[in-house]
Amino acid sequence: MSYVIDRRLNGKNKSTVNRQRFLRRYREHIKKAVEEAVSRRSIMDMEHGEQISIPGRDIDEPVLHHGRGGKQTIVHPGNKEFTAGEHIARPQGGGGGGGRGKAGNSGEGMDDFVFQITQEEFLEFMFEDLELPNLVKRHLTGTDTFKTVRAGIANEGNPSRINIVRTLRSAHARRIALTGSSRALLREAQKELERLKVEEPDNFTDIRETEIEIERLKARINRLPFLDTFDLKYNLLIKQPNPSSKAVMFCLMDVSGSMTQATKDIAKRFFILLYLFLKRNYDRIEVVFIRHHTSAREVDEEEFFYSRETGGTIVSSALKMMQEIMADRYPASDWNIYAAQASDGDNWNDDSPICRDILANQIMPHVQYYTYVEITPREHQALWYEYERIGEAYPDTFAQQQLVSAGDIYPVFRELFQRRLAT
């Protein structure tokens, strides 16, 4: 049996390199199309590809040609509309445009080039240039991790990693190679013995000698060991360094009665986008979900996004719970701590100063980055202004933005998590 081992990096995708080069070349067109797709899509529908349309004029290749030298005077008969230097508009209908024009008998043009990008490519462009700000490498034990990966087959290794199939295949090949000539002689001797028994049954001397030769050849073949140390093959596993920083993201969502269903939907969409971003870009990050009204509760992902529980509004309950969880499970000396909070800004008046106090004294000194989005078309209330004071005290690690409609989610998200240049 023949085995074909395909060691190409791209496998069957022979055009992968060309496709990547094409995506780099038209990156601006694709980014613009992705941003438009994000603005019109549901956040739940973000993990699909997208059709990209590039104007035909933008895919023209540059051409080297002779310039128009000298002075030329040309008379174009019948021209009453244009003067020198004006651009002639593309003819309608018969010009090869992409619109719903009527048929025409003149004009020519070029249709837009349309192609499909995959889910992976869509998400790559969607989250390009985004990151968790101030992610630092902690120097604690266990921060540097390694992942074990397959690295082929080795002739030496741990007995527990022996590759039985490769070992038996190697042993079989060795036996065939070393006993090939003996097996050929054995077949000839067996044929000779059959001929002697049929044609010369009385020639006992030759028959006996042939039988002795057959026994000798069989003994030679059987002396070859079934398995030799040379045949042993082992799965080779190597450790690849997987440098990573331990990070945790706290997601705090207001589900009080003042939050309308539309407002809650925008908040959920913002957190779904954040969750998708975190899971795609960071291997080692934990997410803590906290819902709050008059009281706060840590919940799982399913309950965070789909529970219908509601109540009054005391924002400080969520901040207190976050501080307790930080102290209990995520000490700042071990973890990079992030938080994202979404609310409509409605809060019990006496509670807003408490929120500022908890943030300023118990949370902000320990977090890498804290974001607050207020979902309201109305004027800001006390909570927003208290948080502005936090932003003044922590300009590098605190950010707040306002959301009015679902169309603001992606631009605000990019503003909050835009990659900062190192200073």
UniProtKB/Swiss-Prot annotation:
Annotated region (Disordered), positions in chain: 85-107
SUPFAM superfamilies recorded: vWA-like
Species this chain originates from: Pseudomonas entomophila (strain L48)
NCBIfam families named in the record: PRK05325.1-2 (NF003707), PRK05325.1-3 (NF003708)
Origin: domain of life: Bacteria
Biased composition (Gly residues): 92-107
Annotated disulfide bonds: none
Name by which UniProt lists this protein: UPF0229 protein PSEEN0423
Similarity section: Belongs to the UPF0229 family.
